[in-house]
Amino acid sequence: MSRCIERDRRFYDFLVKTRLPMTITDVAHMFYPSPSGNERSSITIAQRRCRELKKMQYIEISNRSFGSCNYYYVGSKPSERSLRHRLLMSHVISTISCNGFNIIDVETEKSFMDGELRSDIYMIIEYNKTKYCLLCEVDLTKPFNTEGYTKLLNKVMKGEIKFPHQLILLSVSDMKLEDSDIKKYITQVDTELKSFNKFLWKFIK
């Protein structure tokens, strides 16, 4: 990638590692923010860099738009069935990244308990010099996996499963969480992320 700038490399590495598609807005916010905070400038830069990366055959650009935006990806094109879900996953990651969090590591579809539970997003994040492990479920058509996460938390509390930092659970869904013993441990925001501040407030002390 000799003609790529550092931000191109980070963008490309993210796509390769997560296999998530991204809209140009999320690409711009996460990888090409304007120093002045001008969103239009940021998007223009991101569009130019994406065209260059496409020419160098590092990324692909969708032939047709999702809503009003093209999306960008590497490898196999996302299926129509999974596209909205996977775009929302990348949107969640981008939103977290742009709200004062340092994303140290990110994995998608991470399995726990010998495959009994598969988390949509696993991240190690840092906020105000404190690191956390974040498990995020993005649910568009099904309720939050209360049973699976109850088992996981029970094992964590017993010391059978260990995380390197404090564990945070995030649900992104428009379906209400069912009443359960673990409900108090879960922060839920809507799929448009209008209520994202509910998540952010957990870290503001």
Question: What does each of the following model-derived ranges do?
Answer:
Residues 138-188:
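Catalytic cores of nucleic-acid endonucleases
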Residues 75-99:
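Short, amphipathic alpha-helical interaction segments positioned at domain boundaries
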Residues 183-205:
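Charged, structured surface patches that assemble and position nucleic-acid processing machinery
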Residues 1-77:
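Nuclease-adjacent, charged terminal/linker segments that flank catalytic cores
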Residues 45-47, 86-92, 146-156:
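Well-ordered, non-membrane alpha-helical segments in soluble/globular domains
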Residues 15, 31, 50-57, 92-100, ...:
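Hydrophobic, Leu/Ile/Phe/Ala-enriched alpha-helical segments that form helix-helix packing faces
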Residues 80-81, 97-132, 140-144:
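Active-site metal-binding core of divalent-cation-utilizing nuclease and nuclease-like domains
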